[in-house]
Amino acid sequence: MTDLTTLTIAQARDALKKRELKATELTEAYLKAIELANPILNTYVAITAEQAMKMAAKSDSRLAKGHGGILEGIPLGIKDLFATQDVHTQACSYILDGFKPHYESTVTANLWRDGAVMLGKLNMDEFAMGSSNETSYYGPVISPWRKKDSNEKLVPGGSSGGSAAAVAAGLCVGATATDTGGSIRQPAAFTGTVGIKPTYGRCSRWGTIAFASSLDQAGPIGRNVRDCAILLKSMASFDEKDSTSVNLPVPDYESYIGQSIKGMKIGIPKEYYLEGMSPEIVELWQKGINWLKEAGAEIKNISLPHTKYALPAYYIVAPAEASSNLARYDGVRFGLRIPGKDVIEMYENTRSVGFGNEVKRRILIGTYVLSSGYYDAYYLKAQKVRTLVKRDFDQCFSSGVDAILTPATPTPAFGIADEKIKNDTVAMYLNDIFTVPVNMAGLPGISVPSGLSSNGLPLGLQLIGKPFAEEVIFQIAHIIEQAAGMFSAEKWWT
């Protein structure tokens, strides 16, 4: 019998509609898989088994009557950054200990409207600040991938490490995630999954716990390009409750899968060839170029001259916004409260105990760059750099380029508590060097599994598209996926 947890969203959807499979059977299979794997991989921080079975039973009832949404009966994992009504929502931080919101985020409400089933809340870096899922209050997520002939525990990437690892390990059919500087695309690349960061404004941010409001964007992680296209169709919408939400029609992304890319122009930015970059990454990039050429695309060398300034500018803009957003967590209204002799001491006690080290670091950086005397020198200058980064992309796309192809990450996944990365914050931040410019410009970007490293770990390529042209990068990503083949981790934890 087919292992139900290996079905893609498209396969499960078709089987459910034909009544060859029940939503309750599919959900139960995932809950059993989670029960077995979660003590080892630590992907879920809350498992909503009872609620999942009730949602699945309702899906079966609708399907039996010939009704049902585009995700009817599909079991999903939800990143712990999305508010889920009366269910654990803590951004994997101690400061939100015990918080259960009385409202639903717009993104998750859209998924439930379309019939999806919630399996639980997924682990992540605390407040989405991290690139390895090691900053979570609930401990690190263990990647389902291992190097050849090694038992070393690897990171799944971050901040959406739980989402990527759960999809890769077969612990949900797909997952929600968020991307502020690469938090969908980097973990997708590290785990052999597909992850898309949509254009800023495509998915509502309402009910999603904020990190950096001008950069945060929700998106899906799935097993393949088609699954991500199906998920994004549901997640994306205009929302009056989010002032940055854009009122544009949401295309049928799935209909673009399999269409020809003949005649499309693909830009290759020279600035992404970094000094000392792994030859494996360069070789993978060249393979991607060749695959697109063979599919009829035209390759065009381009320049994005301000790319090298994007990462340092990001680490001024993002912490500045984070320091402002996280000021609301004071122990007064919700979450953790550590008493003190007066209200000031209560604030200090709560925030010093409630926030982890990486979050504290970014709050301090943000407070510093926004302080009097440094605002002009750092924050305003970083915003000017951001404008230049965006202008580079605009000029490239206005010259006729349809999409840009780059590596997704400079290396494959590294070890948990890797000493070199652990003792060098900048080395950790450099994991996002290829992804951050996309956020700074507000563009859509997708990571597609494209090969394996010499030690058997997944490597990804990134496609960057024009604003609100996610369908084009889905179309091109599918070509890469078909050429590269599919990659899956061996289930060493069973």
UniProtKB/Swiss-Prot annotation:
Which biological process terms from the Gene Ontology are attached to this UniProt entry? translation
Q: Does the keyword Protein biosynthesis apply?
A: yes
Gene3D superfamilies hit by this protein: Amidase signature (AS) domain
The domain of life is Bacteria
Give Gene Ontology CC terms.
Answer: glutamyl-tRNA(Gln) amidotransferase complex
> One Pfam family for this entry, by name?
Amidase
Q: Into which EC class is this enzyme placed?
A: ligase
> According to its UniProt entry, what is the function of this protein?
Allows the formation of correctly charged Gln-tRNA(Gln) through the transamidation of misacylated Glu-tRNA(Gln) in organisms which lack glutaminyl-tRNA synthetase. The reaction takes place in the presence of glutamine and ATP through an activated gamma-phospho-Glu-tRNA(Gln).
Give the protein's recorded name. Answer: Glutamyl-tRNA(Gln) amidotransferase subunit A
**Organism, scientific name:** Bartonella henselae (strain ATCC 49882 / DSM 28221 / CCUG 30454 / Houston 1)
